[in-house]
Structures are given as structure tokens and as C-alpha cells.
UniProtKB/Swiss-Prot annotation:
Expression is restricted to pharyngeal neurons and gland cells. It is found in: Golgi apparatus, Golgi stack membrane. This is Galactoside 2-alpha-L-fucosyltransferase. Belongs to the glycosyltransferase 11 family. Coiled coil: none annotated. The lineage of its organism: Eukaryota, Metazoa, Ecdysozoa, Nematoda, Chromadorea. Glycans are attached at N119, N175, N301. PANTHER family: GALACTOSIDE 2-ALPHA-L-FUCOSYLTRANSFERASE-RELATED (PTHR22898:SF2), UNCHARACTERIZED GLYCOSOL TRANSFERASE-RELATED (PTHR22898). One of its GO terms (cellular component) is Golgi cisterna membrane. One of its GO terms (biological process) is protein glycosylation. Its main location: Golgi. The keyword Glycoprotein applies.
Length: 402
């Protein structure tokens, strides 16, 4: 019996040596393939069709290491006909606007059985992909092809014109014979353009390991097992642009308190995280619920026509310093059990909710109640998914669900 055990041990040792030699050979051959890839591509003559991988991935060499594996995992149909959008807000809008347009492009292209294409001759499109999309969401950038298509070979079709948040059903273009179709329209801010590919969208926008680590730092360890309500506030240019309505202090606090009371009925530990672009506003609204507020000085005054409520449930409000939008998205994905959109036309607040935990529930302020100017360009049933819950305020300031 002892002889058999030793024999087996020697056999496993020899087998392990051969396995290691095999792995080394595979790694060496893989490296040579990568070198050949660089050499071949350095001598390529210009082509009309440029893949996003080849154009943008030079930024990080590690992207090339994943290229072969990514291509092998793709199972997308290779459509011959192409689709473009005019990408009205893509170069100049915030991250929420950019995501709506580029993901709507892919969703519509899938519905029309066409290849999603971005105009390679437009330098602002290339710069936006390079700076704002590929570094944050490389999997999303991989879904698009850059092409140089002469305008004489493109058929323009006007749709979704002049309104941000209305679904203009693209299925009427399904049987068009045009080889290259471009839809001239604005914003394309409706979940209906891409809701049929939501699992893929969540995969493309999943946080990187570094983003996830940075998001975890924002939440003290003692709160990580709690039921977390994530209140998103949006101020900034919304205060001055004459169209949008920023987060209102009274509604933000009242709606958050309402949700804490609601979920205390089913969860023992309920706390609040405030995400957004105005940390001083957040402190003013939740001053009596904030703990460990040490990363900046307290605001010197209250300019929000707001006073703390006399009656409020007990909870801790965790304020997050504004880092970068993708960190807030990562935080929502990892920790938010409930999201609250306090500025109803905020596209970033929308994405924060759409990409939250799979089991998360979203609440939002009634845009008509807020007197937001975007309401005139919006069909709420096209902008907010039906499972999201609208909140209203009565004459006494009490919050309730519709």
C-alpha cells in the first residue's frame, strides 16, 4: 500500500512538471501572436472600416491582451446594413446624455438588424469615445464599428426630432432596403430603445475592479450589511439653465424620510447614502443625520429656503464626496437597495437607478409637480420604466406613492 502511494505521488509530480511546461509554451506562443498582431497592424494600409478596438485600445496595452478572448466570446450577428444616429448630444452632453445616445444607437440597430456604426470622420465623436467611453466602459466601446461612409451613400431619416424623452418607434424602418441609414434626431432618452438588451447593457457598464474598490471606500464597513436607500441629488447647472429643475431640499428630505419609514417595516437596519454633485446641499438637508462628516468644512449658511424637520425617523445619512460619475455608478451597482431620483429630469440619476442592484427599487419625483421645463419634451411612460414608482407631495408636504 505504501509503494502504491509513493508511485502515485511520483506520477502526479511528473504530470505537474509537464503541465507547467505546457503552460509556459502556451504563454510564449500567445505572446508571439500578440507581437505579430502589432507588427501586422503597424503596416496596414488605411481602410474605410475601422474597428473601435484597433483605433482606441492602443491607450492601454492590456486591452490587446483581452482582444482575442473578447472576440471569441462575441456571438452578435454580422449584419451587412449599417445604422447611425446623428449623436446630437454625444460630444457635449454629460455622461448620462452620452450613454443614452450611444446605447440607444445599439438598441435600435439590434431591432433593425443592422450594424451600429459611428462616423469615423467626425473628430468630436472619436475624441468622446477616446476620453469618455473607452477608458470607463471598454466593453461598451467594443460594441461599435467606426466607418468612413460618404454622405452620398447614406440615407437620412428624421425621427425623435426636437424632443428629448419620447419614444419614436423605429420598427417602421425595419424593412428599409437602404444599405446605410442614419436617423436624424435628438437625445433618444427612452429606455424603450434598448430595454430589450438590458442584460447586455448592464454587462457593458459593469464597474471595473478599480472602480468597485474606490466605490467600496465610500461606505464604512459597519454599514455594508444594512439596507441602503441611495438618494441622488442634482444641482449644478440645473439651477441656472432655465429649463431643468434641481433637487429641492424640502422634497429631498421628506421623500427620504418617507422611504426610511416604509422600509423599516421590513428591514431592521435602514440607512441612507446621498450621491450627487453638491455635497454642501446634501449636508444642509441631512445635517441632523450626518455622521463622520470630516472631508470638508461645514457650509457657512443655508440658502435653500429649508429648515430641518421637527419629526423624522432615526437613521444615519452617509455623504459621499464627489469623485467621478463612474464611481457613483459603481456604488449604486454594489450597494443601493433603493434609489431615489430627486431631480426628475436628471439623466445621470436615471442611469444610477437603471444600473443599481438587480433587486433595487427606484422612486422618482413627479416631474409635473416639480415644474421642470423638460416635462414639455417628455412622455413619462417613455422615460421612466413602468416598475419605477412615482412620488407625490400633498398640500401639507406629506409624501406618498401614486
Amino acid at each position: 500500500m505504501r509503494y502504491n502511494s509513493n508511485y502515485l505521488m511520483y506520477f502526479c509530480l511528473v504530470l505537474g512538471i509537464f503541465a507547467n511546461i505546457y503552460v509556459i509554451i502556451k504563454i510564449t506562443l500567445g505572446s508571439s501572436h500578440i507581437l505579430e498582431y502589432f507588427q501586422k497592424n503597424s503596416n496596414l494600409s488605411p481602410k474605410c472600416e475601422i474597428n473601435v478596438n484597433n483605433l482606441l485600445s492602443f491607450i492601454e496595452n492590456r486591452h490587446f491582451l483581452d482582444l482575442e478572448q473578447k472576440n471569441s466570446q462575441k456571438s452578435q450577428p454580422n449584419y451587412e446594413k449599417t445604422l447611425q444616429l446623428m449623436l446630437f448630444a454625444f460630444p457635449s452632453g454629460g455622461l448620462g446624455n452620452k450613454l443614452f445616445e450611444i446605447i440607444s444607437l445599439h438598441g435600435i440597430a439590434t431591432s433593425l438588424q443592422r450594424k451600429a456604426v459611428i462616423n469615423a470622420t467626425n473628430p468630436s465623436f472619436i475624441e468622446t469615445l477616446n476620453r469618455n467611453i473607452q477608458p470607463l466602459f471598454p466593453k461598451l466601446a467594443d460594441q461599435f464599428t467606426l466607418r468612413i461612409i460618404p454622405d452620398s451613400l447614406v440615407t437620412h431619416q428624421q425621427t425623435n426630432w426636437g424632443r428629448c424623452c419620447v419614444y419614436d418607434d423605429p420598427s417602421r424602418f425595419l424593412n428599409r432596403s437602404d444599405q446605410n441609414l442614419i436617423l436624424d434626431g435628438h437625445y433618444f432618452q427612452s429606455f424603450k430603445y434598448f430595454h430589450h438588451i438590458r442584460p447586455q447593457v448592464r454587462e457593458w457598464l459593469a464597474p471595473s475592479k478599480l472602480q468597485a474598490m474606490r466605490a467600496e471606500i465610500l461606505l464604512p464597513a459597519k454599514f455594508r450589511d444594512d439596507f441602503l436607500i441611495c438618494t441622488h441629488v442634482r444641482r449644478g447647472d440645473f439651477q441656472y439653465d432655465g429649463l431643468h429643475r434641481p433637487s429641492d431640499a424640502t422634497f429631498t428630505r421628506a421623500a427620504t424620510d418617507f422611504l426610511v419609514d416604509l422600509y423599516r417595516k421590513s428591514h431592521e437596519r435602514v440607512n441612507v447614502v446621498v450621491l450627487g454633485n453638491d455635497i454642501h446641499f446634501a449636508y444642509t438637508v441631512f445635517e441632523d443625520r450626518v455622521a463622520h462628516f470630516t472631508f470638508l468644512q461645514k457650509p457657512v449658511n443655508n440658502s435653500y429656503d429649508y429648515s430641518l424637520p421637527q419629526i423624522s425617523p432615526s437613521y444615519t445619512a452617509i455623504l459621499t464626496p464627489t469623485l467621478t460619475p463612474e464611481i457613483d455608478l459603481a456604488f449604486s451597482r454594489l450597494f443601493c437597495d433603493v434609489t431615489l431620483i430627486t431631480a426628475p429630469s436628471s439623466t445621470f440619476g436615471w442611469w444610477l437607478s437603471y444600473l443599481a442592484k438587480r433587486t433595487a427599487t427606484t422612486y422618482y419625483r413627479d416631474i409635473l409637480e416639480s415644474k421642470d421645463g423638460v416635462a414639455g419634451e417628455m412622455h413619462p411612460e417613455d422615460f421612466y420604466p413602468p416598475e419605477w414608482i412615482k412620488l407625490k407631495t400633498d398640500l401639507n408636504g406629506k409624501i406618498s406613492k401614486y
